[in-house]
Amino acid sequence: MIRRLSVAFLSTYRGPQADAPGVTSTGPLAVAAHDDLVSDDLVAAHYRLASMRAPGETKAAVYPGDAGSGAALQIVTDQAPMLVDSVTVLLHRHGIAYTAIMNPVFRVRRGLDGELLDVRPAAEAAPGDGADECWILVPITAAADGEALTEATRLVPGILAEARQIGLDSGAMIAALHGLANDLATDLEGHFPNAERKEVAALLRWLADGHFVLLGYQQCVVGDGNAEVDPASRLGVLRLRNDVLPPLTDSDDLLVLAQATMPSYLRYGAYPYIVVVRESPGASRVIEHRFVGLFTVAAMNANALEIPLISRRVEEALAMAHRDPSHPGQLLRDIIQTIPRPELFALSSKQLLEMALAVVDLGSRRRTLLFLRADHLAHFVSCLVYLPRDRYTTAVRLEMQDILVRELGGAGIDYSARVSESPWAVVHFTVRLPEGTAADSVDTSLENESRIQDLLTEATRNWGDRMISAAAAASISPAALEHYAHAFPEDYKQAFAPQDAIADISLIEALQDDSVKLVLADTAEDRVWKLTWYLGGHSASLSELLPMLQSMGVVVLEERPFTLRRTDGLPVWIYQFKISPHPSIPHAPDAEAQRDTAQRFADAVTAIWHGRVEIDRFNELVMRAGLTWQQVVVLRAYAKYLRQAGFPYSQSHIESVLNENPHTTRSLIDLFEALFDPSQETDGRRDAQGAAAAVAADIDALVSLDTDRVLRAFANLIEATLRTNYFVARPDSARARNVLAFKLNPLVIKELPLPRPKFEIFVYSPRVEGVHLRFGFVARGGLRWSDRREDFRTEILGLVKAQAVKNAVIVPVGAKGGFVVKRPPTLTGDAAADREATRAEGVECYRLFISGLLDVTDNVDKATGAVVTPPEVVRRDGEDAYLVVAADKGTATFSDIANEVAKSYGFWLGDAFASGGSIGYDHKAMGITAKGAWESVKRHFREMGVDTQTQDFTVVGIGDMSGDVFGNGMLLSKHIRLVAAFDHRDIFLDPNPDAGRSWDERKRLFDLPRSSWADYDKSLISEGGGVYSRQQKSIPISPQVRTALGLDADVEELTPPALIKAILKAPVDLLWNGGIGTYIKAETEADADVGDRANDQIRVCGNQVRAKVIGEGGNLGVTALGRIEFDLAGGRINTDALDNSAGVDCSDHEVNIKILIDSAVTAGKVTPEERTELLLSMTDEVGELVLADNRDQNDLMGTSRANAASLLSVHARMIKDLVDNRGLNRELEALPSEKEIRRRADAGIGLTSPELATLMAHVKLALKDDVLASDLPDQEVFASRLPYYFPTRLREELHGEIRSHQLRREIITTMLVNDLVDTAGISYAYRITEDVGVGPVDAVRSYVAINAIFGIGDVWRRIRAAGDAGVPTSVTDRMTLDLRRLVDRAGRWLLNYRPQPLAVGAEINRFGAKVAALTPRMSEWLRGDDKAIVSKEAGDFASHGVPEDLAYHIATGLYQYSLLDVIDIADIVDREPDEVADTYFALMDHLGADALLTAVSRLSRDDRWHSLARLAIRDDIYGSLRALCFDVLAVGEPDENGEEKIAEWETTNSSRVTRARRTLTEIYKDGEQDLATLSVAARQIRSMTRTSGTGTTG
């Protein structure tokens, strides 16, 4: 039973009415979803409630709730209409929220005493079987008021009884209404003596026709203010009520409409109307027919012209209006239709017209119209209000209700509203008057109506109206005011007074698209500020804005956003914040300080919004230290630099230190401004000293060592700053684009790691950061787009070390720059679009970075040559105008962009600023980098006896044919057999290539734009080969590939990384690197040490590489330790810096040539049009000049390798000297430790080729520094070589301009040093300075003199030509080393025997021509063993293809050295040089001096002391020969030959000569020619002399 009842209840489930209390959803819902509403206990309780009920009785109870259900109202009553409506209205009126209502109708059988016998759903019962009952169940929400529910439950029986009675009497009431209408229509008895009776009859029929819900009826006899009800007439609710209303009207009107004082329970908020019809059956007797009911919706919306009785009054009103043509008839008709229908019953035609005309007169005026009408019984006052439609809001309506209740003394109020398309809203208020109110106490006079109307008008005046009034004095147009009256959102209007909006409008009107304005104001609350943030064009989320504010050191207490559109449609967002500063931030002491703080705060947050300031705690300094945001940026930039420098403290810690020490922080800024503010330049030094002292005093007072270190680091950085663009105000500067640049002196920055460059520029902005490191005034190197945001300086420092070494061969020293993009574009998923967006941002950051560099770089006035300091830059260093850049990783195509930036600055270098641009030397077209590296390859192979240009050889490579270095390199010989190669996309395998056909195909790919290995013609690949993607899971390995790569026989497939490793370890002749990345390391290195994670999977160790030679066209392909390991394992390799130096060399030539040509353009000697043609016409010769440097260096490296073991001790001392005096770091440069050098000495090996290359570079760099610091480049004897740096055409056409070149000193120096080191060897200058005790510059002087005197350069070139002609490298190396011995000995001679400092030009004049004349006659003077030795040596050279004259010249090299003594002696004794030569060489032969000298050469030189001892003996022997020559010449005659002179001398000095010869004979016979015996021999020769032999002539 219970379950059946539950199903019946649930089948009628419906939600609450939409306007019921607590409604969240309405309407019927799925039954299954509400099983939990009806528990068995609940249904059982309902069943118990229904178990006993008398007919007509209503049972109601409240179920208190259980574990399954909440509280519920339970009702059992007879079935009748309108039961549920009555219950829901009752609950609504008592404010009781319910969750559902269920009202199943059951067919019930009961016993005589009302006990329940049977119950079943009525639909299932047979007709006539029992009575229908409605069981109503209303689940109540838990929040419902218990007392209200109890009261509602008490009222239920009575209310439902009325509903039931209405249903029972419904027909009778309608019949009574029709009956009365008939009586009125016929009036047979004359009871209705009124002209309107037929209209009233029609009205009653209209009411009965669905326009009036009848609730009750009664007849009353009225008279003398009393009413008596006829009991038999009572129907509906009036049947159940005994109270009797007094007469409802005192007028003679036939029909009166009154309103009940109690609301109905049949409709929410509805008060029933009473339709009263007066019948007069006798002279003094009046009967009121009272029909109580509710107008239906149809009635309330009915056309007034279709309602009987009312329609006539309306027509009469309109007719009256027609008499005046000015009255708008249709408008009047429309207005009348807006009057609530019940009110029409109370209005006459005249009143209707007056009301309508008043509304017409209201027009578009923004005011309110009120019509008052009091009930004659003083029960209520009807208030009809017309107001502008847009002014009708809930808030306005509620305020109107308050006014009307207050002003009319009401006890309550009801309303109904009508809002249509007309300009007005119509609200009908009914003010309920307190019971007992006297009719004459209700004031509805015109005066009171007007007064209340004014109050209502004020109530309807909205915020916008008040704002417009408040703006009377503001200069804002009426149209704008009208716009903003509607534009401001409601929440804004609730938050702000209208007058506050006037200031906002002014700010809003000043906004631009994507602009911002902030206003900070104090509030009445302590330490609480109001911040208003205005945004034009773009909104922002709270998650965007809060971090900005929090970074300023404030807490956001409250946030309110508002949105509106400006008059021009620009969307504007207003955010109002309540903020409070951190408790540790001091409050501004006075109003002026508060205003200043507010302005700085607003400016700072504005800058943050625009991206000019980063979001971090540095921003707190605006309030803590009283700084501007620009000053904060200075400190932030220094902090960023410290982090890049490897400072051990985090940025967070640095922020905390500065914030906790605001006074010191302020002092740091004072110091910075004192140093660099151009407006303080006159007394800036004094201010700076004071500021520095203040900073020092602040720091000295600190207790914390960490804090001390942080603040001292900032002070150190500021004092190490040489220049800044902070004060630059030019609109085209980097500073104007929010870029800050510091030029620093790294040598005095204590926190910097080694090595420290000479100059450094740090560029900072929120968008880009970068550094540019320079190791000298004239320096060059590439700019890299780095992806290492956290440590890009570390990356650049590593690169600049290699660049410094690479630049050893060119004019500028090493430099390197790099930048990071800090705000890359958000990825969209569209790869092409993302790439383009990323590139565009990179280009813009590159521009900003270069602009930052140029902001602090001097310029040169081309007309005068004067150096010009950038405006508004305080310079704390000397002139510094040389800044050039080059392409690097990520910036390969950016040269033109760099030159555009330089041009915008009017920079003196023009497009020489960045070489490789569209007007310049195209490195790829020239193939210059690859060709330079190929010189290294050719040299390595020549040493193995292989000619790469005529003999086939096998190669594996890194790169593809579209690349510059790889592509050009693999076309430099048609004998390349490329076995395998890979790039980032593909792997190429050709195990048995045909050299010729594969060269042709590689050429085709090289010429094919954007080609890859996938484009290679597969039909040309040998059997077993192919092209495979690196994305494949595995790659099959053919037998042919196994053989070519030296793989084990069981290898049948490899993953791409494993295959690439196999390629790198392949047993081939050459490994050619033309790619990007590091692929070979040392076994002792971890992959993490390499810093190239992308290639960790494929990297191999140097001792695993089986290629015989590695050619490094690309950079960093092998680690420094990896190169050494490969070399020690038997491989041949230099350094990448040496191999690929042709690129930078070519760029340097381009820069210097452009400087030269541009000077000619300025002078009018060359037109701008001719400039490009002139530049490009020299491409080939420039290439040859560059490659000559590569050949020279490779020849130097070859001979250095050949001599490495014997010179290890010298090299070790050189390294130590560079460490001690030049700041060289062995570990950084991968040079061996002293322990490793001892190990190699024991093993009989010297420095490896990479180590020699590094040592060579540092020797050149050191020598360049020394020469530049001297006056050598300014002397003609050195400067005369300057023109030969330039191509022939420039030498011919611009000879004068060459002499005045801006970098003439640097070019001369570079030429001098390259010539010296490449010709005389790496150790020449060091050994000379060590041996003789002179400076490096003296060594250069001696070399230049010797070079000119003996024609060393010409001889050297002839040796190289012999090598090119096929003479073995071992032979040409021997010849070169022999030539260097001449240079060594001759150089020392000049430094020992000639006045110092050496007058190079004079010495050349003194010796040059005579040496040239005497040298060809050497064969005339050499005798005995000397002649035999020379002949044998020359013959050996000639046997290897060396031209005989060259062979003989080299063989006599050490004898030519003696010509210096010969010529000097001849000058001293005034004898002919040929006579002296004959005597000198006769003495040498006679004494066997050459044998002794040869023995000396065989002495050990393992350490410095042995070397010095060797040198001393040799010098002693030569010195004795010189002295003896003087003695012999003194006793001989000019016409005697050498032997005759010697014989005569021996006769004269027989005793000394005899003793000496006896000792020498014993030494020769003994054969033990060690240091001791040779020392004795030298002493014996010296003992023969009678003079010193060391005299000099001027």
Swiss-Prot record:
The role this protein plays is: Catalyzes the reversible conversion of L-glutamate to 2-oxoglutarate. Highly specific for NAD.
User: Which Pfam families does the protein's record reference?
Assistant: Bac_GDH_CD, GDH_ACT1, GDH_ACT2, GDH_ACT3, GDH_C, GDH_HM1, GDH_HM2, GDH_HM3
Family listed: Belongs to the Glu/Leu/Phe/Val dehydrogenases family.
How this protein's activity responds to pH is stated as:
Optimum pH is 8.5.
Top EC class of this enzyme: oxidoreductase
Q: Which reaction does it catalyse?
A: L-glutamate + NAD(+) + H2O = 2-oxoglutarate + NH4(+) + NADH + H(+)
State its Enzyme Commission number(s): 1.4.1.2
Output one GO MF annotation.
L-aspartate:2-oxoglutarate aminotransferase activity
Query: Entry's InterPro entries?
Result: Aminoacid_DH-like_N_sf, GDH_C, NAD(P)-bd_dom_sf, NAD-GDH_cat, NAD_Glu_DH_ACT2, NAD_Glu_DH_ACT3, NAD_Glu_DH_bac, NAD_Glu_DH_HM1
Q: Which organism is it from?
A: Mycolicibacterium smegmatis (strain ATCC 700084 / mc(2)155) (Mycobacterium smegmatis)
What's the protein called, per UniProt? NAD-specific glutamate dehydrogenase
In this protein, the active site sits at 816
Per UniProt, activity regulation is: Activity is inhibited by unphosphorylated GarA. Stimulated by manganese and magnesium.
Oligomeric state and interaction partners are given as: Interacts with (unphosphorylated) GarA.
Cite the entry's keywords alphabetically.
Answer: NAD, Oxidoreductase
